[in-house]
Amino acid sequence: MAEKIAPPRWLKPFNAVVLVARRVGLGWTRELPVLVLPGRRTGKLRHTPVSVLDLDGHRYLLAGFPGADWAANARAAGVGILAVGRRNERVRLVELAPADAEPVLRAWPVRIPQGAKIMRDAGVVPDLEPDSFAALAGRCAAFRVEAV
């Protein structure tokens, strides 16, 4: 997974603003899921807004870009906290094999259209078709979220 596509330049500052807004409880940000993982080098807790896909009774996270830092931190740590609203849930993140990731990837543009549009606009996929997302299997990490 050496390939790395840069996220849009506005994404990191936008995420920082969203995290501050969430912390003070502003509007829609209150219920925004945030993944909290230790950094793989520093051990410092890293907070990343995420989209959680509910599919067939399981929850999934998708790294929106090949080489995403949070995905590398998830691989290194294996466990973290999924914070939604005032609830903090300790979770295990299990990376899916490419074949297992395909149905999750196919569902992504249908169930998480805003995240899918960001991926398209950044050049990760050419369009919003489920087949284009399925082709990301093995390039963009997909994780099953399990309660610990």
Describe the function of each predicted region.
Residues V36, R144-A147:
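Short, well-ordered beta-strand micro-motif
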Residues L19-R22, H47-T48, E129-D131:
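A generic local structural motif
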Residues R30-G64:
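Short beta-strand segments
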Residues R23-G25, R59-A72:
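Covalent nucleotidyltransferase core used to form phosphodiester bonds in nucleic acids
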Residues M1-L26:
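Extreme N-terminal tail/first-helix region
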Residues F65-F143:
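Short, structured beta-strand-loop surface elements
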Residues W28-R30, G138:
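Short gly/pro-enriched beta-turn/loop segments at secondary-structure junctions
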